[in-house]
Amino acid sequence: QVCVLFGPSAAGGAYIPAFCDVVVMRDGNASMYLGSPRMAEMVIGEKVTLEEMGGARMHTGVSGCGHFLVESDDEGIDLAKRYLSYFPTSWHESPPTAPPAEPAAEFPELPVDENKPFDMRELIDALVDAESFLEVHKRWAKELIVGYARLDGRAIGIVANQPKQRGGVLFVDSSDKAARFIWTCTAFGVPLLFLADVPGFMIGTQVERQGIIRAGAKMISAVSEATVPKISVIVRKAYGAGLYAMAGPAFEPDACIALPGAKIAVMGPQAAINAVFYNQLQAIDDPAERERRTEELRAEYKEEIDILHLASELVIDAVVQPGDLRSELVRRFAAYASRERAWPAKHNAVTPV
C-alpha cells in the first residue's frame, strides 16, 4: 500500500498512512497527528504549531512516519510510480527488470584510515545503474542509508552505513529504519545488498534507556528472517554486533565479500587490546615498554583479523578489488535470481519491538 498524503490525516485517520508500506508527504500541506495543536493545548497545556505537532518535515525527519518529502502533488504521484517500479505485482513473482545502464560515477577513493569519514552515496553511485537509486527515509536516521536501485537492470534493496553521519554507528532509529526496509524487501522478493562500514551499535546510558538492545535485536532479527538473496560487502570495517546487523558471515548470507584491507572482528584493535590486556599493560611501569608492548599486541591482533587470512579460512567468500566489485555483484545476483525459496511449515517470528 502506498500513501501519498496531500493534506491532514488526524486522530484515527492518522493510522491509515501508518499502516501503509510507504508514505509520501507534501511539504507544507501534509500532516498527521492523533490530537490537534488546539486539543493539545486544552488537554495537556502544550502550545505547539501544526508543523511541530505532525507536519511533513517533522514526520520525515524526526518520527520516521513519513518516507518521502515532496514539494508538489505531481511530484508525489510521480515518486509513487517510481517507487512501485521496483516491485512485482505479486509476491509470487520476481521484481521487474529494466534496461541495464552503466554507473554514473567512478569508484571513489576510500580513506585508508577507517576512522575518517566518506560519503557512502558516492560508492553506491559507482555500483548501481545510473539514476536508479531511490533513497528511502533520506531525512531520518541519516547514519544509515536504505533504498532501492538497479544493478544491471535488476532491482535490489540497499542497506548501507553512512560514515559521514555519526561515524556510521547504529542508533535506535537507524535500527528501526533498517528492520522496516529489510522486511519490505523480504515481503516482495527484492534481493538485498549490504554495504558495511560500521564501528558497531552506540553505547551509553542514553541509548540504553532508549532501548538500543531491543532495537538492535529487531534489526538483527530482520536480517536473519530475510529469505531473499543477500550479499554483504565489507567496505572498510565491521565490528561487534554491527557485523551481525549488516548480514556478516555468522548469518550466512549468500556471499560475504570484502574490499582489500577491510576488517571484521568483535571490536577494533585498540578497543580489543584495552579490553583483553588492560591489566597486563597497566602492570608495566615503564611507559616506553608499555607502549612497545601495546604496539606488539596491536600488530598481533591485526594479523589475526587480516582479511586474506579470514578468506583462507572461508569466513569471507571473496576479496575483490574496488574496480571489480560491480561486475562481481552483477554476476552473483544473476546466479541467485534462479534460486527457489523453500518455505518452512510455520514461519512466525516473535520480533523485538
What are the functions of these language-model segments?
Residues 1-353:
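Ligand-binding clefts of soluble mixed alpha/beta catalytic domains
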